């Protein structure tokens, strides 16, 4: 069972079909995550921004089996995610496309997965007939920007860890 820590609005922004009312979109998003959690039995924590219109204090909810955290007024979800990966002994899989948060999580010993890759897992689990070999078909999936020593086909240690964690989701 994995502990998944999600940057809520970051992941919602990458998903298709979530235009319009913010609260209705958030409910549909949480319903999709709940279906995923039911299938995979992972512990999921979603952190939402309250920076511009939140409460005076940080609030926590438990809905549909998902732990939801709303940051307090003036605080970003990024700050809560950084605090959680720093303070907790649990190994998190952090889902975000925010490079700063991802690099902070990885430097703290956690795994960071881009939102786009997790979205594929989220939809694939609800549609098992989807093609599982998308990485083999995508010619740009494995790109290397620096010349490496050793086996040129072997992914970096961080990339192998990220791939292993993504495959386990």
Regions found by a protein language model. Give the residues of each.
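Nuclease catalytic cores that cleave nucleic-acid phosphodiester bonds
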Residues: 2-5, 10-169
């Amino acid at each position: 069972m994995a502990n998944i820590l999600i940057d809520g609005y970051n992941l919602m922004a990458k998903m298709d079909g979530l235009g319009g009312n913010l609260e209705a979109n958030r409910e549909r998003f949480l319903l999709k995550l709940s279906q995923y959690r039911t299938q995979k039995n992972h512990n999921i924590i979603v952190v939402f921004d309250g920076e511009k219109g939140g409460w005076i204090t940080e609030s926590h909810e438990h809905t549909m089996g998902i732990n939801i955290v709303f940051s307090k007024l003036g605080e970003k979800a990024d700050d809560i995610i950084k605090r959680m990966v720093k303070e907790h002994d649990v190994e998190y899989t952090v889902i975000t496309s925010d490079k700063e948060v991802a690099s902070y999580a990885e430097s703290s010993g956690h795994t960071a997965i881009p939102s786009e890759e997790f979205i594929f897992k989220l939809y694939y689990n609800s549609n098992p007939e989807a093609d599982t070999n998308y990485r083999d078909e995508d010619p740009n999936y494995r790109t290397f920007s620096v010349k490496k020593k050793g086996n040129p086909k072997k992914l970096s240690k961080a990339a192998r860890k990220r791939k292993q964690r993504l495959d386990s989701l």
